[in-house]
Amino acid sequence: MKFEYHVKPTGNDAACGDTEHPFATISKAAQMASPGDTVIVHEGVYREQVDPRRGGLSEHERITYCGAEGEARPVIKGSECVQGWTELADHPHVWTVVLDNTMFGDFNPFATPIFGDWLEMPKFGEDPDKHLGDVYLNGVSFFESTTLEGVYDPQPRDTDEDFALKIPCPVPDVDRTRYVWHAEVDENAGTTTIWANFQGADPNEELVEVSVRRTCFFPSRNHVNYITVRGFEMAQATGDWAPPTSQQWGMIGPNWSYGWIIEDNVLHDAKFSAVSLGKEISSGDNEWAKTERKTGYQYQLEAVFKARRIGWEKGLIGGHIVRNNDIYECGQNAIVGHMGSAFCRIEHNHVHHIALKREFFGWEVAGIKFHAALDTVIANNNIHDCSLGMWMDWQTQGTRITRNVFHDNVRDLMIEVSHGPYLVDNNVFASPVMFQNWSQGGAFVNNLICGGIEPHTVPDRSTPYHYPHTTEVAGCAVVSGGDERWLNNMFAPQPVKPTVGEYGLSAYSDCPMSMHEYLERQRAMWADPSQGGGERNPLQSLYAGGNIYLSGAQGLNKQEGAADDSERMQEDASFFGGTASTSVACDEPMPVTLVEEPDGLYLQCIVPQAVADTRMQVVTSDMLGVPRIVEERYEQPDGSDYVLDTDLLGQALTATERKAGALNGLVSGENHIRIWEWNN
């Protein structure tokens, strides 16, 4: 028998939970709900950490948590309100409050330093600690000062350094940098003292909140499956630094479960990650940072095999849907995951303003950061104003990144130590840096690319690949570089020079022209006795065709406007599949601007006639062949073929030809096209 439970702030947890007698907390309903039940949460603020006791049994017997129709979103907060502030007589605008540690329970974020594998700033043992806690004035978070003196006279900053690229980046809100806090925890006295500079505001008259809870909606146990969370606002949970070798906390997440749907929510101001589809703790808990016995790479490799031993399999872990969420103002990620992010669908989310406070940094920071996202589809998301839009790391296999819009990021996309096959198609990449590539085996088809491309090899890390559509490990390999397909893309450089990389495909010009040339290079390396008995890993072939190079973009031969890459397809047809498709050079520029309007995001551009007239063959799985190492077809998660006849806007074609780039409807001259909108 299916039940419908109701929750209202004015309710009573001793009640029965029906419409007339609602519970007061979501947590009470989460203890009662059984498979097939629905928990309807009415508008109001809920300061609690929801730990669902049970999951559903199947896709048809879920437990659903949803906001009440026709009401404002219910809000779950990881913070508590704080009053009783006292202003310092000798330091105007600086106020202090002493909190009893009992308000935090067994987790005090102001006593817990940021720590873990791949954390670079603050550097453990070198830099002063920073902490998981935060202070909020009317919903806006402050910055932590590592000294009390820094609270007395904070200096505004108009630029911060991007840690990865070492370039200056403008601060979005300069005045906000003067709002700072410092805390000291006295375990003997059982108190936490916070000092904060409110810049003239009276904290006893305003809404001031401090971090208390690590999560908002997160089961404490694994395998709490088939839960839907819809229509909430969640904010101000701390989470924790979330590398792939630790428990990956999120403001909301399934905690190593299967079949969750997280949809139609507003998720913001997580100190670290808003949504975690990540790893549990038994397969790794920051052992590199704790012991230094082995490297982080080795512990991460071990984590894959440990996870297999505890049930990392298709149908048991992952398989989540994250869609139609607005996610912003988070310190590390909007969405993070390792292995639990396999077999998922990440669709139509608005991901923005991620990691722009730059209070900390490590090699896990991006709007979306996944490891081992096997067969995961990331589609139709709007990703902007992030230090890095998307970072796919380790085992990007069977993954598809399609119909997304990237803009106003420091970097749009990074893919690391993966061997394919993965597909990046029908996206708009409008930031100055489109792609940092530390990987191989990708196919890039029908994208509009405005930024620079920078490829790398990775000879010192051998990472896993899998049998198709499973988590079973088939082998490990290093990244030799190349073995990629670049077909039907439109390279449209903008006036802003990329801080890294080159426009077009010229950065790949050292790749061999064919599989035959690759083998000749490898044989020459084996003939050199000075290299010993180790592996030989020369650059692999690159396959390109059907691309348009506008003014400023260079083809593989590094000559601007010289774009005939077809021989790479013709000579290698037996290995690569497909047929010849000649690229096109156009010596005219194509200015591209993205504009936010009330009804969505618009792309404005002036298209040269030569570009509008081009027609390229629709790309299919048969045209893409297989990556050299993995030997898996480029195909959909269910094993069916790709037929890339649908553009960014979802417009399917009936012909076998289409325009290069992501928009088949471009016309000569001025274009003003809505490329992303909310469903409602």
Name every feature range the model reports, one short phrase each.
Residues 2-256, 276, 283-312, 473-480, ...:
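Extracellular polysaccharide-degrading/modifying enzymes targeting complex plant/algal/animal polysaccharides
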Residues 407-411, 420-454, 464-497, 504-553:
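Catalytic-core region of carbohydrate-active enzymes that cleave or remodel glycosidic bonds
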Residues 9, 43, 54, 67-69, ...:
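Residues on the solvent-exposed faces and adjacent turns
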Residues 271-273, 277-333, 338-367, 371-373:
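Hydrophobic, small-residue-rich alpha-helical packing segments that form membrane-like cores
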Residues 49-51, 214-216, 238-245, 249-250, ...:
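Short glycine/acidic-rich loop motifs that flank beta-strands on beta-rich extracellular proteins
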Residues 39, 63, 74, 222, ...:
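Solenoid scaffold repeats with emphasis on beta-solenoid/beta-helix
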